[in-house]
């Protein structure tokens, strides 16, 4: 049974400077909630209540967000503004939060390895908060993946089709189709040129990982820019036939780009905020 979810959140968010100069990109608001809150809500919906966050310098506001603000709550007590804190109070009450720092930015694989003390020796999820995933017609993306893990008991990556010219932005997989939405991975390439990509099936920021991934990351040699990529460690797992790729149901917004961030804001405003589902 998966109980833990890891959130790598130590990056600089340079694509959103100067907004992220003094604020983590994970705290950027989509209408009335920061990205990280949407992500933790998704984890809790999937039954994952033990939250680990890998932070860096200048990320204290992440910890403050998932803590009680006594002064604020006293100020708005017995007013109609109390309803705005119902969602975050639920997360504070129902989740446990633990934090560790990634001292150097050495890629996603290194960030996940940094979170090892928070996870221990058990399967866990990884969520990249700037990939906002929403499914208004059923289970959240992470809940879909947890159900799949309970069936197959192996590492799983979420994928979606992308335009061929955009494969150089993603890890890209190819593999044997098990059913329409599931592939057994046999090839995984990090940010290939379009002409070298094995497919247009791109990995997005949702993973279920088995604990042996930590040792595999430790054995992975740094690549371009000295970064350790999670795709390299996952490829080692795939060679043993134990990595699945899942075409999830729902919408994904790349909130690491201005275009995706605006698209997400418009979608959430129309479908969540205006309908009273955004708290």
Curated annotation (Swiss-Prot):
<comment type="function">
    <text>May play a role in stationary phase survival.</text>
</comment>
<keyword id="KW-0808">Transferase</keyword>
<dbReference type="InterPro" id="IPR005835">
    <property type="entry name" value="NTP_transferase_dom"/>
</dbReference>
<comment type="similarity">
    <text>Belongs to the UDPGP type 2 family.</text>
</comment>
<dbReference type="GO" id="GO:0006011">
    <property type="term" value="P:UDP-alpha-D-glucose metabolic process"/>
</dbReference>
<protein>
    <recommendedName>
        <fullName>UTP--glucose-1-phosphate uridylyltransferase</fullName>
        <ecNumber>2.7.7.9</ecNumber>
    </recommendedName>
</protein>
<dbReference type="Pfam" id="PF00483">
    <property type="entry name" value="NTP_transferase"/>
</dbReference>
<dbReference type="GO" id="GO:0003983">
    <property type="term" value="F:UTP:glucose-1-phosphate uridylyltransferase activity"/>
</dbReference>
<dbReference type="GO" id="GO:0009244">
    <property type="term" value="P:lipopolysaccharide core region biosynthetic process"/>
</dbReference>
<dbReference type="InterPro" id="IPR005771">
    <property type="entry name" value="GalU_uridylyltTrfase_bac/arc"/>
</dbReference>
<keyword id="KW-0548">Nucleotidyltransferase</keyword>
<dbReference type="InterPro" id="IPR029044">
    <property type="entry name" value="Nucleotide-diphossugar_trans"/>
</dbReference>
